[in-house]
Amino acid sequence: GGGELIPMPTHARNPQGALSRWVSVAEALKDYPPLDAKDKKSSFDARIPYHRVPILDEMKYFWVSNTPPGRTAFDNQCVKCGFDDNPIHSNLRDKEGVNRSSKDTPLYCLKCGEMLPRPSTVNADGTRRLMSGYTSAYKRMQANLPAPALTRNFSYACSDQKIHPFENRVLSIAEALKIHTLSDYEYEW
């Protein structure tokens, strides 16, 4: 006989019995002062060790600041005319079964032609194109849910669901430690 590979649940949205209630991202981060990745002055709080974030360049800040909770910047809509029916980004399996990001996601508003606040890069000829990326890249966390798993790349806005739920930045190291519950213990680094 083999053991179970999936551990028994310990938490739930609506706990019963011995289960504990989920801890949301907002609850975990409630005691941290706000930061902003727009400039150096607002990107750290000297009172809390490791509570600092990388500064985003102007384009990345534009993408992040227009990304709603639970959504990816690849789905951002037009900030000029307010048109909100531009196609959103998707992942598709190719004929070999490999998951590939869509090549049809528009970079310009279908109504007014303005560039959308979506991750893009400049080609050698000076034209812009949408960056390659999956639907979890440049994605803002949802404040009312538990945090998604954090990877070693959590300090990059393009990393999987690592944009702060309501501030224009990624998580600080201090916040990542809190989400992983490491800040609940005394460590000497």
Give residue ranges: language-model regions.
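C-terminal target-recognition/interaction regions appended to catalytic cores
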Residues: 43-189
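Flexible, glycine-/basic-rich loop-and-beta segments that form/coincide
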Residues: 1-42
